[in-house]
Structure formats: C-alpha cells, structure tokens
Amino acid sequence: TPLLKNSPKASIINISSVAGRLGFARRLPYASTKWAMIGFTESLAKELGPSGIRVNALLPGIVEGPRIEGVFQARAESEGVPYEEVRDRVLNNVSMKRMVSAGDVAEMAVFLCSEAGKNISGQSISVCGNVENL
C-alpha cells in the first residue's frame, strides 16, 4: 500500500458476487469466498480509510457472455430441456428480468474511482438487476 498512500485519489475495487450476499445452494465454497470478500472489503476500508484510500466491492449478478451461456447450455442438456427454458427460469429470479453486462460492472467501477465516488468506501454494491434468488 505505500504507492496507494502516496496517491491522492487512491481507490481499491474488489470483485465479489451477489452470491456472497444471497448464498447459493450447491455452491457453498463459491458463495463462502464471495462472502469473505465482502468482509475483507469492509475491514480493509476501515484500515486504509485514515490514509485516504477508499475500498469498495462490486457484486455482479448474472453477467451475459460465453461463460453463463455455457452454464445455461450444460444445465439444459442435463435436464433435457431447451436452452431458452433454463435462461428464462434463471431470469425469473431477477426483478429486472435481464442479465447485466461486463460494461455495467465496469461503469460502476469507474464511478467509484471518480470524483463523484470520493465519499464512498466500505460498501459492497450489487450490479445485478436485483437478483432475488440463485
């Protein structure tokens, strides 16, 4: 942290997951490590705050792209149902009924590092369209 302490607008952005806040059946190790990242973020913010370093975490939800498409496809094949059925079932657990993009997550990171985010620290911010259940 010596370089960060010498930087006037230092900001650390950790990446966790909405699974760290909600829990995730059959994915205990994943959800546990994401929960730990939330606690790490809050603790580090308290430790580094007096030096002017802000620390926050982003909690992405279901991020569109090849990875989640593969997950949906594998689940569809194992259940013997169409891909669209799996996708729709998952998105029914999201209030906004859509996935987020990597760009959505990046835009929040940029905001947190900007002048507009100068007083935000120790926060875990969901970028998820309000995932209700995983």
Regions inferred by a protein language model and the residue ranges of each:
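A short helix-coil junction within the Rossmann-fold of NAD(P)-dependent oxidoreductases
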Residues: T1-S11
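Residue(s) in the substrate-gating loop at a strand-loop-helix junction
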Residues: S17
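Short C-terminal tail/terminal secondary-structure segment
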Residues: R21-L22, R98, A109-V110, S121-L134
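Active-site helix of classical SDR
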Residues: T33, T41
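Short, flexible catalytic-loop segment of classical short-chain dehydrogenase/reductase
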Residues: I38, P60-G70, A74, S78
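Short, small/polar-rich loop/turn modules that mediate ligand/substrate recognition or access, typified
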Residues: G49, R54, I120-G122
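A conserved structural motif in NAD(P)-dependent oxidoreductases
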Residues: E79-P82, V94-V105
